[in-house]
Amino acid sequence: MPPLQLLRSLSALPDINPVVDFPAPNPAPKSTVAGDAFPSVYSTLAPHALTNLVFKHYDIEVPKGCRFWHRGLSDVYLVETLADDYILRISHQHWRTESEIQFELELLNFLADRDVPVAAPLRHRDGGYALEINAPEGKRYASLFPYAPGGVAIGDLSKTQGFLLGEMLAQLHQTAQRFKPSAHRPPLTLSYLLDDSLHTIAPFLHHRLEEWRCLIDISMAIKTQLTSIPTHTPYWTICWGDPHSGNVHFTAEDQMMLFDFDQCGMGWRAFDIAKFLQVSMQSGLGRNIRDAFLSGYNSIAPLTVLEENSLQALTQTAFIWSWAIHVQTLKLSDYSRLHGSYFKRRLENLQQLGSTDWQLF
């Protein structure tokens, strides 16, 4: 829905606090008496059971341990064997469809086959790359990856690493122009990045109309500025979706391995750069390193003047998209943080990104 229609529809929202609109579990229990399965929306799978699953379906050494490593947009487990370590990623039923997951895995295999250093999924014994799990809340999907050598840059990226990462992103974009997926996932259009995000945020600004109107005005200005960017190559290609220093490992020799393509999709290559800038500024990465990243990218695939002039609006777009994803996550895991000051602070950060000194923040 366009922003103006969203604004008009805001007055029609019920005068209640926003609630989490979860799909019913499949199949939904008919009752919740003792002995029946209670409905679930966000289960935690037992590491010992996942150890057995991995050993049964993958040609790896006997696991000596499995640890719940991180909960984010997927649940991540570290699987350890005597010889090697692996990352087991379990999708969330409410976040990704089977088709969206297959798209990502196809992309990773495509890039790895063309010498782009990505952590590609391992094939299981049945020939596929994802295992279906019947979790209490519905179907989830497990994929196993080799543990990326090296580690996250200590104290964040150096200038050299920033330059190298920019170079690699440009090479990824060029290589991915030939990617022909069999699976579908939504492209990173302004409708997906902005309009859908506003739908997520809108109910929480029901009683904060001034802030809502400000958000609408910013979104409309972004759309006006970005309407002239073409949607064909080289401007439009496969995007990583979340390029930043936390999603790449560097060895001591500055060899890199990229991972976490959960937010990938067809989009503007300049959006990937803007996403790097948005995350980097939010985490406090120095301007000199951000500039080195841009220099690295331009050394392989120079941006046009139109794209360079669009980076600020695209960085704001990336911020709004990330904001909406964060809201969706908090609705599941920490609703107490979704209070007025949270939205006030986020809007202030967004306004800073729209200032003439936006690169200073």
From Swiss-Prot:
SUPFAM superfamilies: Protein kinase-like (PK-like). Pfam families: APH. GO terms for biological process: threonine biosynthetic process. Gene3D superfamilies: 3.90.1200.10, Phosphorylase Kinase, domain 1. GO terms for molecular function: homoserine kinase activity. It comes from the Bacteria. Belongs to the pseudomonas-type ThrB family. This is Uncharacterized protein sll1119. It comes from Synechocystis sp. (strain ATCC 27184 / PCC 6803 / Kazusa).
